[in-house]
Regions:
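Intrinsically disordered, low-complexity RNA-binding regions enriched in Gly/Arg/Ser/Tyr
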Residues: 1-23, 28-40, 44, 48-84
Length: 84
């Protein structure tokens, strides 16, 4: 399951997401989205884990404080490929 996390502190790293979500199950992937030009965080990211564990994590973490900000945690949506 793909989990979308928004309103992240701009200093949050991939390792921070892993530490936050690992209490809910095995993580198969994590990434912070960064600006292509500046390489600065855009304040959101994704975590991959099983559907059962992901639903537990969403229920437990959505609306909680992490590094000074209230985070939003939800099921991630698949994006349509960009047209060439």
């Amino acid at each position: 399951m793909n989990i979308f996390i928004s309103n992240l502190n701009f200093r949050v790293r991939k390792e921070d997401l892993i530490a936050l979500f690992q209490n809910y199950g095995e993580i198969t992937g994590a990434r912070i989205i960064v600006d292509k030009e500046t390489r600065r965080s855009k304040g959101y990211g994704f975590v991959e884990m099983s559907e059962e564990d992901g639903m537990k994590a969403i229920a437990a973490l959505n609306g909680t404080e992490h590094q000074g900000r209230i985070i939003n945690v939800a099921v991630g949506q698949e994006r349509e490929p960009k047209a060439l």
